Amino acid sequence: MPGHPRDATLTALLRRELVREEHPPTAALIRALAGIHARGAFTRAEFKLMCRWKSPRARHLWETNSPARIRAVSRAVLATRSERRRMELLTGLHGVGVPIASAILTLIDPRRYGVLDIRAWQLLFSLRSVTTNARGQGFTIAQWEQFLSELRRHARHLRVSARTIEYTLFLCHRKFQRGLLYARSERRLRRSNTAV
C-alpha cells in the first residue's frame, strides 16, 4: 500500500479514473509484437513500428539504424536484468531518447513498463510524486527510473499493469490540462500574437 500522505490524492485519482481498456490500435500493436520475447530480439520493421507509435516526427533519425545494429541492441536489451542497462542500450540507438526507449519497453512488456511522457510526468509532478523536471521534457534515465518505480508501486497496489497506471495518468492529464502542453509553444504563440 502506498505509504506517503501525498499518495492518498494520487491513489484516489487512479481509483476514480482507472482505464482498464487499452487504446484499440495500441492493443493491436502489443499483440503484433508478442513474439519478441520468445525470439529474444526485435526486427528493424518492429523497431520502426514502435518508434513511429511514440514519435513519428523523429522518423528521419531512428530510421538510420541498421537492421544488424537494431538486432544486436534488442538482443542485449532482452538479455539483461538491469533496467538502467536496458535504457542505456536503447538510447544508444540513433534517434532514440528516453521517451521512445520507454515506449519500446512498454510495447514489449506492458505489464512491467509504462511510457515516460510529458503528460504522465506533469501530472505526477503536480501531485508531488516526482520532484524534478516540472516541464516534463528532456528526461534523464534517473527520472525514468523514478517514474517506473512510481508506476510499479501503484500498479502493485491496484493490481493492474504499469501501462494501465501510465495510460490512466496520460488520459487524466489530457482531461484536466489547462493551457498549452509545451512551454516553448506558449512563448512562440505569445511572440506571434504581439507581432500582429
Task: Locate each region found by the language model.
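C-terminal accessory module of base-excision DNA glycosylases/AP lyases that mediates lesion recognition
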Residues: M1-C51, S55, G114-V196
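Residue-level detector of functional hotspots within protein domains
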Residues: H4, I36, A79-R84, P99
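Helix-hairpin-helix/helix-loop-helix acidic hairpins
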Residues: R52-V96
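Catalytic DNA-binding helix-loop module of base-excision-repair DNA glycosylases/AP lyases
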Residues: R85-F125
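Short charge-dense sequence patches
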Residues: V19-H23, H37-R39, S66-R75, L93-I104
